[in-house]
């Protein structure tokens, strides 16, 4: 990419040099007598060609350091010319800078007092030589490859502005996430330290130990560790995103020199180093907590060993029991064991004093190893930080060197281009004309193609917009219909509730009858254009619409009275009877006990062999089960005086059932309308 950018800058510098040479040309001199024909013209042409070739070699050697290295290795005297014109080679400068940075890194690392073995340095991969690039001679007769135009300052400014906005947002987000991760890490460290402190207090004070606090502290520490792990992952992801934006900006030639890139990279390095340092602190806290865990394990082991010894001496005594007295033998055995234990502990103490120095040296060795691990981690973190900082300094130095190189190259190309500016002007003018012709033709074709594509897209967008408008219109209609269906469904349920309960404020049967005119008119207002609804509303009985129907419970209560009176007059025919006949029927009803029976839905009724008692019993069962429809069918089979008494009840019950059936049809119609209008 740098080579392509350098070639572009070379071509643009040549153009500017020719323009300046044309503007600053001397005034026309008086005509000179044409020289005589001689061999001087050929010599001048040869000298001009030599100068042009030498200038091309010098320019390409500046652009491609590998080509310069090959030329210097092939022709050693050329090295002095290149050093005088172009300065010292960039490869040598880079090697020298790498050596200086290596010395700086080595000096920056703090040296320990102990003499450590030297680190083995991995050998650098050998630099593979590139294949020599073939330079084709310029031929005016051939088509010149169109040059990629340099982006305008507005485009460069817009891209840099966009990059800066992205970098600011990414830096702010990364800093926020790293701040959250740091706070979570600090909470984890506090939780680990708290767990270690509670564990030490619990182990030291075994009598009043509360291990639930230790468990809860450990759970808090683990929970905080999970939280800070997630926060750390988020923070590093945001840092990687910031570095990705920086790398993308460096790859783009228009934004590669933006000074904010280096600052953003430095910020990313600092944030990453901050996470590494806080991780080192967390590891240190966990290591200190591990020492307390080992101490707790040793205490538990000694207590278990003592419990086993006590159990072997006093197998029948629960040493963990409270408020239990020991007998004399158990106390003697316990005292003897205590004396033996004291003697044993004295011997162990003397041995322990001998081994104490070994244990201390071992503990010091373990602590030294732990300190070395921590120091190694800190050293690796610091080395990575120093390495990233040095890389950043190298990039900053490269940016500064690149700007100085570009200035030197521009001055050298101006001096080199002054000798053959006229010839190159003619060539470039011709190539530019050809390029403009081709470019204008391509632009016209692209504009025409884009215009056709735009027309197609506009047509498709208009068609899509019309479809969306139609869909929205139909959806509005469906919404209105669905809303009306829901209102109709609610009104239908209110109608059923009115049929079932009537006027709840009524004190007697007649006052609880509520006319249905108001509810039916409300249904007509909700669906004024529905013929099915109007037909069902017109089918309601007039008595139900004007006076109202009895409620279901009132009809059941009336049937209870009808059942009692019907059994008393079951033996009376339609023409009535004497007082003795009524008395006999009453006495007969007293001696005939209605045994509860279960009648099935498929049981047939023999009309000729069924009396009024069985009919009333069947009707009572159906009424109690809430099946008024079958109750009416059975009650219609009554004969004599009970049939006359049941006539009004049958009419009122039939009116109630008809109204309820019509209301249920309206509810079903409302449910279907609601489902149909749901999209």
From Swiss-Prot:
Ranges that cross the membrane: 43-63
Region annotation (Disordered) ranges: 1-42
Mitochondrial matrix side: 18-42
Organelle transit peptide: 1-17
Superkingdom classification of source: Eukaryota
Record topology, Mitochondrial intermembrane segments: 64-679
Record keyword RNA-binding present: no
Compositionally biased region (Polar residues): 8-23
UniProt keyword list: Cytoplasm, Membrane, Mitochondrion, Mitochondrion inner membrane, Transit peptide, Transmembrane, Transmembrane helix
Listed GO CC annotations: MICOS complex; mitochondrial inner membrane; proton-transporting ATP synthase complex
Membrane topology according to the record: Single-pass membrane protein
Compartments, as annotated in UniProt: Mitochondrion inner membrane; Cytoplasm
Keyword Transmembrane among record annotations: yes
InterPro entries: MIC60 (IPR019133)
Phenotypic consequence of gene deletion: Egg-laying defects, defective oogenesis in 30% of mutants, reduced brood size and increased resistance to oxidative stress inducer paraquat. Abnormal mitochondrial morphology with mitochondria appearing larger and as localized swellings and tubular extensions. Mitochondria also have elongated and curved cristae that are stacked with a reduced number of junctions.
Gene Ontology biological-process entries: cristae formation; mitochondrion organization; response to reactive oxygen species
Any Pfam family matching the protein: Mitofilin
Tissue expression summary: Expressed in the gonads and muscle cells.
Family as reported in the entry's similarity comment: Belongs to the MICOS complex subunit Mic60 family.
Subunit structure and binding partners: Component of the mitochondrial contact site and cristae organizing system (MICOS) complex.
Function description: Sustains mitochondrial morphology probably through maintaining cristae morphology. May act as a component of the MICOS complex, a large protein complex of the mitochondria.
Identification of the protein by name: MICOS complex subunit MIC60-1
Underlying gene: immt-1
